[in-house]
Amino acid sequence: MRLDISSYDIDNLKPITNGGHRGNFGACYLFYGDAIKIIDVDKDVIKKIDIEKRLEEASKVKVEGVSLPKMLVYVNNKFIGYTMPYYNAPNLKVILMKYKQGKLSITSNDINNAYTSILNKIDVLSYYKIIVNDIKPDNIIYLDGDFKLVDCDFYRVDTSLTYSDSLKKNKEILNHAYKKIINKYFECKTYKDNDIINTSLRMWFLW
């Protein structure tokens, strides 16, 4: 679907500042209950991947808990971004920083729940041959006991892949991302803590 708006409309959008729905290649704003991302389409990395085509293909798919594009946005017939479901909650990076600062506790069970929640979503995405490409704490939002995927600029549909191939690629991306999270945020200070985290990692890679 397509949404045509004016530059005046963009100038009057309210920025999202709660730590969620932020990306490296654009800014996100509130838009009638959804989020709208205005992409810097002139950046070289954006030009190279034909992001408009990617987002158009992804907009045909709906997955619960994944902020896939709803409509592509144009100003004066020029592609500038897309709308997506808005989740009003902090991202995982904010949560992990609070953990590291000692402001909240996170157990191995919490870690496993996060992994399982994301795994369930990439399983459905894999059915539609969507490769996630960009999983990191900035792009994961925790809301109502569930972990949501946002900022899907670099997702791509690859119809040449089977479901199994898509799932394999997505699990590799997910496992790599979560291993980085463990290494960065969980500096285990005791043998007991280290054993808990290593047990979590073993559980993840058995999937």
Description of each model-found segment:
Residues 24, 39, 120, 137-140, ...:
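Catalytic phosphate/metal-binding cores of nucleic-acid and nucleotide-processing enzymes, i.e., regions
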Residues 122-144:
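Catalytic-loop of the protein kinase fold
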Residues 67-114:
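Conserved structural core of kinase catalytic domains
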Residues 2-19:
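Conserved N-terminal boundary motif of the eukaryotic protein kinase catalytic domain
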Residues 108-126:
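Conserved alphaE helix
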Residues 14-72, 103-104:
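ATP-binding glycine-rich loop module of kinase domains
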Residues 144-207:
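C-lobe/activation-segment region of protein kinase-like
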Residues 30, 86, 141-142:
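Conserved hydrophobic "DFG−1" position in protein kinase catalytic cores
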